[in-house]
Design a protein with these regions (language model features):
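Detector for methionine-enriched segments
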Residues: 1-4, 57
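Short amphipathic recognition helices of helix-turn-helix/homeodomain-type DNA-binding modules
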Residues: 3-27, 77-83, 87-106
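Short basic helix-loop element that most often maps to the first helix and adjoining turn
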Residues: 14, 19-58
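Short N-terminal amphipathic alpha-helices
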Residues: 36, 61-69, 77-80, 94-98
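Flexible domain-boundary/linker segments
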Residues: 38, 42, 72, 83, ...
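Recognition helix of helix-turn-helix/homeodomain-like DNA-binding domains
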Residues: 42-46, 52-53, 59-76, 86
Length: 106
């Protein structure tokens, strides 16, 4: 289980960093095997890895909210939300740190 890195500051996240955050989240999502995570195999998948809906469910956040985060929209996730997303995406401690940096919370 991933733990929260020490919070240093909250800053406004520039556009390019939000885009990098979105690209990072998408890459992690696409790299995961749904069956390995215990998710049922339901029909044919149009995209590799997890669906956004599955990540949102595993992270205990709303689908729309997770989608906006992955799309690089201007949202302000809390530390708890980022930890949930990091756990859902099975991020390493280094990847979790990167997630916090890209979200402007480290």
């Amino acid at each position: 289980m991933t733990t929260m890195p020490q919070r240093e500051s909250t800053i406004a996240v520039p556009d390019d960093r939000r885009k990098q955050l979105g690209a990072f989240l998408r890459a992690r999502r696409e790299s995961l095997d749904p069956q390995r995570l215990g998710l049922p195999r339901v029909g044919r998948r149009r995209t590799p890895g997890l669906r956004r809906e599955e990540v949102a469910m595993l992270a205990d956040v709303g689908v729309t909210w997770y989608t906006w985060l992955e799309q690089g929209r201007e949202v302000n996730p809390s530390e708890a939300v980022l930890v949930g997303v990091a756990n859902a995406l099975q991020c390493s401690p280094l990847e979790t740190r990167l997630l916090f940096v890209l979200a402007g919370l480290a």
